[in-house]
């Protein structure tokens, strides 16, 4: 599965960004509190497009750390090892819009590391 092309459209009143068109997808807003992080994980049956909604987002993707600007997109191919985190010194929670493409199932998660003791 390839990253969908984001389309930017200017309008007289401003603009909009279209992330997917007529595709089956699941959209969530992930919120990560200061000093917290999600599981280091991967999914077999879905890829994800993450859009940073706030400054201070930290994404680990296949062993590399990414600190995207607000509104920046990060493509997580199916099978990629990833996690979201928020630095302890960040004065606010950080949010990412997650657009999951492929077969979405909350059980399609392989946790490789989890600070909360989940498997």
Mark where each language-model region is:
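Double-stranded beta-helix
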Residues: 2-10, 87-119
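A short glycine-rich, His/Asp/Glu-containing loop-to-beta-strand
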Residues: 4-46, 99
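Glycine-centered loop/turn positions within well-structured domains
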Residues: 38, 47, 57, 82, ...
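Glycine- and acidic-residue-biased ligand/ion/polar-headgroup-sensing regions
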Residues: 45-63
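Short hydrophobic/aromatic patches on the structural cores and recognition surfaces of FHA
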Residues: 55, 71, 96
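Short acidic-glycine-tyrosine-enriched beta hairpin
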Residues: 62-81
